[in-house]
Amino acid sequence: MLKIRLARGGAKKRPYYSIVVADSHSPRDGRFIEKVGTYNPLLKKDDANRVTLKVESIQEWLKKGAQPTDRVARFLAAQGLVAWTHGNNPEKGKPGKKAQERLAERAQREEERKQAEADAKAAAEAEKAAAAEAAAAAAAAPAVEEAPAEEAPAAEAPAEEAAEG
């Protein structure tokens, strides 16, 4: 199968690519059939020499069945040679199995923590309510005990007056 792809050249940290037609089994920078263009990523994006293509030669190879790689297809689409569509791979961005398991565990721990906080808050509210109820009962109980105590001396006072008189 024939591919139209990039073959890297240039020095370390200074890439320069040749756009070549090559067998898909040959190495990236190895043997190729024909050089059909160049790509220099170091030049500015609006520079005319950033991508140079031999359009007639590329059209011939496309007719013969050569398949462009994604990056080369973008260059060819810019020249109007092929219709390039953005590939959509929603699976690529998803985390792996282990990461999903860790996320599930973290979510479960967070849920348990929130539940524990809610339980603790409810227990604190119940304790407060019980303490308030006990305080109210304690306040009501002495008031009830004191009220008959006040009446009793008042009842004794007339009895004492009657005994004296």
Curated annotation (Swiss-Prot):
Annotated coiled-coil segments of the chain: none
GO terms for biological process, alphabetical: translation
Source domain of life: Bacteria
A molecular-function term among this protein's GO annotations: structural constituent of ribosome
Region called Disordered, residue ranges: 84-165
Gene3D superfamilies linked to this entry: 3.30.1320.10
Pfam families: Ribosomal_S16 (PF00886)
Organism annotation: Caulobacter vibrioides (strain NA1000 / CB15N)
Official protein name in the record: Small ribosomal subunit protein bS16
Regions of compositional bias (Basic and acidic residues) in chain numbering: 89-130
Compositionally biased intervals (Low complexity): 131-157
GO cellular component terms listed in the entry, alphabetical order: cytoplasm; small ribosomal subunit
